[in-house]
């Protein structure tokens, strides 16, 4: 087995030979084998082959076929979650339509909606949109065909779906989220739903994302610390350049009287001290020598 995905009362497994097997509840055809008889043992979805990825939702599922050439869906469809332009359920896979020439890199399935990620960084979603989970603001009636949530070239590398929300990982390590936010699952610092992608607060070096029922998760790799350089004897301009090179910024610049006028315009002290390990982007304050009130001797 190369991948397992669990829905509500049923499960899917993808084998290395590209076949998909399903077991559990089958009241609306979510096992994909043409019947609505639940099964306590895995049954093969014979209509599928060359499958490279799977995702199970509440009562429906999606599969990526032929390395991303197409995406297929089956099961319940009362909110259009199969993406075939109808709201009729299907006990065998049907092709998701109207995604143009997008080559598919990943798929996700939520409560009554599903989404795909294109290799071009675009995100497409369909199904229920009661809390903005399709991300194409404003929230609206269900979409029975894919709508474009995020345009190509966005840098999105992974998507994940919760009950009524989604998260997306960008190549630079930031994370976007949209949809329901009743329990703060969007990570924005509020509980207000959002109908279009917004950046999750505080995540800048994430490497993986996942979404649960009412929560979101990210693997976050902390940045290595920045080391404060020695700035004594530098001019303010030189200090700023040295800090920038170290991944830091210039903070407060104070002036003290240099009564002998031999360090005018030069850094006399700094905070934090040289060699201190700090968070990248931190500010370093400096003190610069200035002339006496009555001028230099």
Please give the residue ranges for each predicted region.
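Short coil/turn segments that connect the beta-strands within blades of beta-propeller domains
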Residues: 9, 18, 59, 69, ...
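Conserved core positions of repeat-based scaffolds
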Residues: 10-13, 22, 60-63, 73, ...
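Ligand-recognition elements built from short beta-strands and adjacent flexible loops
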Residues: 223-297
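Blade-level signature of beta-propeller repeat domains, shared across WD40, Kelch, NHL, RCC1
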Residues: 207-223
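Short glycine/serine- and acidic-residue-enriched loop/turn motifs that recur at repeat junctions
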Residues: 24-41, 72-92, 126-145, 176-196
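Conserved GH/AH loop at the N-terminal boundary of individual WD40 repeats
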Residues: 7, 48, 57, 99, ...
């Amino acid at each position: 087995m190369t991948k397992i995905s669990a829905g509500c009362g049923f499960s899917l497994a993808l084998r290395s030979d590209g076949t998909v097997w399903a077991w559990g509840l089958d009241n609306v055809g979510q096992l994909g084998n043409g019947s609505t008889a639940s099964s306590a043992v895995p049954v093969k979805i014979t209509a599928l082959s060359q499958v490279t990825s799977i995702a199970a939702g509440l009562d429906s599922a999606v599969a990526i076929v032929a390395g991303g050439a197409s995406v297929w869906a089956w099961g319940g469809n009362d909110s259009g979650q199969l993406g075939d332009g109808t709201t009729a359920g299907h006990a065998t896979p049907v092709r998701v339509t109207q995604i143009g020439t997008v080559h598919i890199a990943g798929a996700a399935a939520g409560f009554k909606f599903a989404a795909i990620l294109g290799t071009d960084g675009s995100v497409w979603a369909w199904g229920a949109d009661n809390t903005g989970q399709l991300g194409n603001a404003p929230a609206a009636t269900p979409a029975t065909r894919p709508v474009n949530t995020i345009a190509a070239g966005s840098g999105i590398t992974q998507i994940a779906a919760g009950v009524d929300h989604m998260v997306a990982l960008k190549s630079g390590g930031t994370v976007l989220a949209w949809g329901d936010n009743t329990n703060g699952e969007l990570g924005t610092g509020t509980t207000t739903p959002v109908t279009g992608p917004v950046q999750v607060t505080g995540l800048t070096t994430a490497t993986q994302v996942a979404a649960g029922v009412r929560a979101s998760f990210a693997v976050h790799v902390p940045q290595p610390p920045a080391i404060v350089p020695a700035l004594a004897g530098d001019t303010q301009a030189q200090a700023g350049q040295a800090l920038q090179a170290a991944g830091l910024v210039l903070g407060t610049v104070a002036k003290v009287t240099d009564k002998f006028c031999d360090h005018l315009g030069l850094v006399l002290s700094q905070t934090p001290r040289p060699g201190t390990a700090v968070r990248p982007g931190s500010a370093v304050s400096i003190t610069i020598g200035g002339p006496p009130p009555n001028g230099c001797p």
